[in-house]
Amino acid sequence: MNYINKVMLVGRCGQEPDLKFFESGAVKASISIAVRPPYRSEQALWFDLVAWGNQAEVIGNYVRKGTQIAITGEFGFDRWADKNSGTMRQKPVITINTIELLGSPRKEESTSTSAPNETQAVANANF
């Protein structure tokens, strides 16, 4: 039996990309996106995304908070040991396979200098 693990999302980036460069030359970008349901009264759904290599470089160069993107990727989990207790932790994450830039940040989002808001806190919450 074959299995399919494919995710397709269109949403707006919720934060500036977090880029990491490794000694091996690998590049990793981490972002979150908000996907708004068709009915405005419903709250947006937040997804944590990671990208490697060329996709990470595209994200670092062109994606900013508020940029609308479309991605395809694979669902998985980041796993790590808690530094204090040694307990294994995990959070859901989507690894990007393809990314398409759909639009620039909205004016009010790109010029905002306010403190982090509730949506940023939700985007960074551990599940």
Swiss-Prot record:
SSB domain segment(s): 4-103
The keyword Ribonucleoprotein belongs to this UniProt entry's keyword annotation: no
Region (Disordered): 104-127
Classification via CDD domains: SSB_OBF
Cross-referenced Pfam families: SSB (PF00436)
HAMAP family: SSB
Protein name, entry field: Single-stranded DNA-binding protein 2
Lineage, opening ranks: Bacteria, Bacillati, Cyanobacteriota, Cyanophyceae, Nostocales
